[in-house]
């Protein structure tokens, strides 16, 4: 009976995803060209920093370029330099928290997202990253007990996503609710980017469904809104997707070599 229920849930999840993304087609993207642009910008910003080592903008932008290149340690150093130059920036520096997360310094990441809550008590995306950090360092129970509290509304689909991370909404229901909202096509594409990114991460972390997670993160990476805007979080989605894809491939190769 338990197996049957799980099978039905998996069927419903894949059915929901197929309905929501029925019109979506694959998108090609020149990653080498993207990395080259980041490398060139990194060099220009390094030159700017040499000429003006107190330029917060240059440290900030170079930190971004380095993070987008997957140079998390270097990005962290640049972001921390900003705070050294202007300590008032610490409370609002969520990007530093993301660098800490990918460096697996989860306690520092959780702290950074915690203090950001004092700066912006509406942004549930920040609360999700704190959950992710606490999940990595202390497990699901502590992560859920430590979920930040929000009273004001937030942009879609973050209220839905936050309910999912709290354990009060199933991943498949996030996409059902998005489909039922009757957003315009362009706005729906934007909402789906965020939905795919964080439902994917939820499946990876909480449900340990790494292949399903990879499929959703691929959709976040290929999302038309994400690719056309190239936002900071699309860059994070891109990095996370390829990181998980490599991990899944390594895991699969390990199973093949063991004969299991």
Regions found by a protein language model. Give the residues of each.
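Canonical positions in the second alpha-helix
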Residues: 47-48, 81-82, 115-116, 220
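Residue-level recognition of tetratricopeptide repeat
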Residues: 64, 98, 132-134, 201-202
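Register position in tetratricopeptide repeats
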Residues: 68, 102-103, 136, 205, ...
